[in-house]
Design a protein with these regions (language model features):
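Long, charged, glycine-rich C-terminal linkers/tails
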Residues: 190-196
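Positively charged, aromatic-enriched nucleic acid-contacting surfaces
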Residues: 152-156, 197-220
């Protein structure tokens, strides 16, 4: 006998929220549960269930959270951020959430339907992690300059040609930004965030930059086994996104 999608509590969509505002409220509810658990030193499963639009915990009746939030053209930044965090260990900064949600909305509007977790990750990767033109980091080494600053020597591909650039600064990120001046790339860092990745990848560090590249405001992201490498990859990501936009 078929079960209607919204039939409590066996329907496929009984816990699903399609509205962006509902999804955002649910995401904030999950965040509150985790905050209470951390503050009271409890397991999150032992915290009193109080999540908007979900009168009971799906896990209590053998369901999962997978179907709770569906990504579609109505989805807001909060629900997209929730899936990126819970499924992929990626904690996007707020302004980057806004930027990426616009990309997701553009794709779902143009293609219709929904995006699953894998499709969301593939879109994030293609937008932020996989761009290798016109700049690609190959390797780098760090030393200490005479004034105590970090000195970097980086091997990069620039428009397909391998070259070596050098710079100094207060930290590896600032030194790399200084080195990019040799390629006539001006990067001004507005915000930088980093965290350890807690789920789903061999890599264990993620870095995000909000910056201006030759006057163009842009975000970048990098993932690597080293936070230093991840931060440089985030700058490369921002450079490639900005210069690609300039070419278009």
């Amino acid at each position: 006998m078929p079960v209607t999608p919204r039939q409590p509590y066996g329907g496929d969509l009984v816990f699903t929220a399609f509205s962006g505002s509902h999804q955002d409220a649910i995401n904030k509810g999950f965040d509150d549960l985790n905050e209470v658990a951390a503050r009271t030193d409890k397991n999150v499963d032992d915290v009193t269930w109080e999540v908007p639009y979900l009168p009971i915990d799906p896990k209590d009746i053998g369901r999962t959270y997978e179907a709770v939030i569906r990504v579609n053209s109505q989805s807001g930044k909060g629900d997209i951020a929730y899936i990126m965090k819970t499924d992929h260990g990626i904690r996007l900064p707020r302004r980057m959430q806004i930027e990426f949600s616009k990309t997701v909305q553009h794709v779902t509007d143009s293609k219709g339907g929904e995006m699953n977790s894998k499709q969301l990750w593939d879109l994030f990767s293609s937008e932020y992690l996989d761009r290798a033109e016109p700049l690609q980091r190959i390797d780098h080494s760090l030393a200490t300059a005479d004034n105590g600053d970090d000195a970097i020597t980086a091997t990069v591909l620039w428009h397909g040609k391998e070259c070596e650039i050098s710079g100094t600064g207060n930290g590896p990120l600032a030194a790399f930004v200084d080195a990019l001046h040799e390629l006539d790339i001006d990067v001004s860092i507005i915000d930088y965030q980093e965290h350890a990745i807690t789920a789903g990848f061999d890599a264990d560090a993620a870095a995000y930059v909000e910056c201006e590249v030759n006057g163009i405001p842009v975000h970048g992201a990098g993932i690597a086994s080293s936070i230093n490498v991840a931060s440089l990859c985030a700058v490369v990501s921002a450079v490639n996104r900005a210069l690609t936009e300039l070419d278009e």
